[in-house]
Amino acid sequence: MEVDLSKLQVGQMITPTWRLKPIYIVRREPSMVDKLPQHDADLKDPKSEDSIQPNYARNEMRARRADVLVLIGICTHLGCLPKQFFDAGDPVLGASWPGGFRCPCHGSRFDLAGRVFKGSPASTNLVVPPYAFRGQDTLVVGVDAIATQGAA
């Protein structure tokens, strides 16, 4: 599945469907990425060692590029769809909330890299699907690499 990112503004999310699953694609602000290490102690799996993601997303950002987050938008607890709460200090989630996602079914909370907070019913981070970029503004979900023209 190809997604045009050229109109996705910083701080926005789109949710296309891939293999009947919602894909959360977020254009992260630099401040969103900068805050990620600040709450590692509050996460169940901050290094994503027990979570599902391609090797290239096994980093603090859980992404190929800092500015684009790609997740399967299904809670790893019981399969509900987490809602976006990107604003730090959101009144619903409290002053210490760094921004991220909250599952409306049982309250699991995930940061802006899809990592699950301690105290959440979900046991693992949100899944990162395979994906690659074709140029700066085209995201291809479902593949780990894109063949270049003339490659054998």
Cite the ranges covered by each PLM segment:
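Short strand-connecting beta-turns/loops that link adjacent beta-strands
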Residues: 8-10, 30, 136
